[in-house]
């Protein structure tokens, strides 16, 4: 288990998820090699000593005006509390429906599940077949001295008008942004204004892919941008 003093201050909901959720362990080629608790997968000590790498997904949901839905992670999140990030970021779990690698179906099933859990978006608002996997990235990012991320992340894009009812255990705030509004958020984060922080995985996607992919979102040509054969190592 972890450090008792540190864990004692952990939010009860987050603590339960840390030990109940089983993440999918993969190698750097995205082959499944086992599973471990969410707790162990986010301990920097384990990440560094055992090179634990787990599968993840990041949803980028746009409305019909092609504005991107962002969320601010709740203050009780163990990793990266109160940072702004893309619509939803989480992990497929080690269960049959979320282990399916073909057409990224496992990640898409997990995305539908977590959009309901975090943002209250009903499954019928985000049909699994409407998620378009555009790519995969591999990255490592410490959150603080104890916690961090080491993920092979599926980037899932979807254009839908949805009903949003955020879960306060997961989400502190939400907003839709245009390209220009996102660029202003980036400027503020870089300048340290208003205490604004962005998640490291979101920033990697923004810096490497997002704005060119946004063109495809608006043109309805996302399939042309998709590259699920490559794994972009952004470490």
Curated annotation (Swiss-Prot):
<feature type="binding site">
    <location>
        <position position="54"/>
    </location>
    <ligand>
        <name>Mg(2+)</name>
    </ligand>
</feature>
<dbReference type="GO" id="GO:0004452">
    <property type="term" value="F:isopentenyl-diphosphate delta-isomerase activity"/>
</dbReference>
<keyword id="KW-0149">Chlorophyll biosynthesis</keyword>
<feature type="active site">
    <location>
        <position position="151"/>
    </location>
</feature>
<keyword id="KW-0414">Isoprene biosynthesis</keyword>
<dbReference type="Pfam" id="PF00293">
    <property type="entry name" value="NUDIX"/>
</dbReference>
<dbReference type="InterPro" id="IPR011876">
    <property type="entry name" value="IsopentenylPP_isomerase_typ1"/>
</dbReference>
<feature type="binding site">
    <location>
        <position position="38"/>
    </location>
    <ligand>
        <name>substrate</name>
    </ligand>
</feature>
<feature type="binding site">
    <location>
        <position position="77"/>
    </location>
    <ligand>
        <name>substrate</name>
    </ligand>
</feature>
<dbReference type="GO" id="GO:0009240">
    <property type="term" value="P:isopentenyl diphosphate biosynthetic process"/>
</dbReference>
<dbReference type="GO" id="GO:0050992">
    <property type="term" value="P:dimethylallyl diphosphate biosynthetic process"/>
</dbReference>
<feature type="active site">
    <location>
        <position position="89"/>
    </location>
</feature>
<keyword id="KW-0460">Magnesium</keyword>
<comment type="function">
    <text>Catalyzes the 1,3-allylic rearrangement of the homoallylic substrate isopentenyl (IPP) to its highly electrophilic allylic isomer, dimethylallyl diphosphate (DMAPP).</text>
</comment>
<protein>
    <recommendedName>
        <fullName>Isopentenyl-diphosphate Delta-isomerase I</fullName>
        <ecNumber>5.3.3.2</ecNumber>
    </recommendedName>
</protein>
<feature type="binding site">
    <location>
        <position position="151"/>
    </location>
    <ligand>
        <name>Mg(2+)</name>
    </ligand>
</feature>
<dbReference type="GO" id="GO:0005737">
    <property type="term" value="C:cytoplasm"/>
</dbReference>
<keyword id="KW-0413">Isomerase</keyword>
<dbReference type="GO" id="GO:0046872">
    <property type="term" value="F:metal ion binding"/>
</dbReference>
<keyword id="KW-0479">Metal-binding</keyword>
<dbReference type="GO" id="GO:0015995">
    <property type="term" value="P:chlorophyll biosynthetic process"/>
</dbReference>
<keyword id="KW-0602">Photosynthesis</keyword>
<dbReference type="InterPro" id="IPR015797">
    <property type="entry name" value="NUDIX_hydrolase-like_dom_sf"/>
</dbReference>
<comment type="similarity">
    <text>Belongs to the IPP isomerase type 1 family.</text>
</comment>
<feature type="binding site">
    <location>
        <position position="73"/>
    </location>
    <ligand>
        <name>substrate</name>
    </ligand>
</feature>
<feature type="domain" description="Nudix hydrolase">
    <location>
        <begin position="52"/>
        <end position="204"/>
    </location>
</feature>
<dbReference type="InterPro" id="IPR000086">
    <property type="entry name" value="NUDIX_hydrolase_dom"/>
</dbReference>
<comment type="pathway">
    <text>Porphyrin-containing compound metabolism; chlorophyll biosynthesis.</text>
</comment>
<feature type="binding site">
    <location>
        <position position="42"/>
    </location>
    <ligand>
        <name>Mg(2+)</name>
    </ligand>
</feature>
<dbReference type="GO" id="GO:0015979">
    <property type="term" value="P:photosynthesis"/>
</dbReference>
<feature type="binding site">
    <location>
        <position position="90"/>
    </location>
    <ligand>
        <name>substrate</name>
    </ligand>
</feature>
<feature type="binding site">
    <location>
        <position position="149"/>
    </location>
    <ligand>
        <name>Mg(2+)</name>
    </ligand>
</feature>
<comment type="pathway">
    <text>Isoprenoid biosynthesis; dimethylallyl diphosphate biosynthesis; dimethylallyl diphosphate from isopentenyl diphosphate: step 1/1.</text>
</comment>
């Amino acid at each position: 288990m972890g450090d008792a003093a540190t864990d004692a201050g952990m939010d009860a909901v987050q603590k339960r998820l840390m030990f109940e959720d089983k993440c999918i362990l993969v190698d750097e080629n995205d082959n499944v090699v086992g599973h471990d608790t969410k707790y162990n997968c986010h301990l920097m000590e384990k990440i560094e000593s055992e090179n634990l790498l787990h599968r993840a997904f990041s949803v980028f949901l746009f409305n019909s005006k092609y504005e991107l839905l962002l969320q601010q992670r709740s203050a009780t999140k163990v990793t990266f509390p109160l940072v702004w990030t893309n619509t939803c970021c989480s992990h497929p779990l080690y269960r049959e429906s979320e282990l399916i690698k073909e057409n990224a179906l496992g990640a898409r099933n997990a995305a539908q599940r977590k959009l309901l859990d975090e943002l209250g978006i009903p499954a019928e608002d985000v049909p699994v077949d409407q998620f378009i996997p555009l790519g995969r990235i591999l990255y490592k990012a410490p959150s603080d001295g104890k916690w961090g991320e080491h993920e092979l992340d599926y980037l899932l894009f979807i254009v839908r008008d949805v009903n949003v009812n955020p879960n306060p255990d997961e989400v502190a705030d939400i907003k839709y942004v245009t390209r220009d509004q996102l660029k202003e958020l980036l400027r503020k984060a870089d300048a340290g204004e208003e205490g604004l922080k962005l998640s490291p995985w979101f920033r990697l996607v923004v810096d490497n892919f997002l704005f060119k992919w946004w063109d495809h979102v608006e043109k309805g040509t996302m399939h042309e941008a998709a590259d699920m054969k490559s794994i972009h190592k952004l470490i």
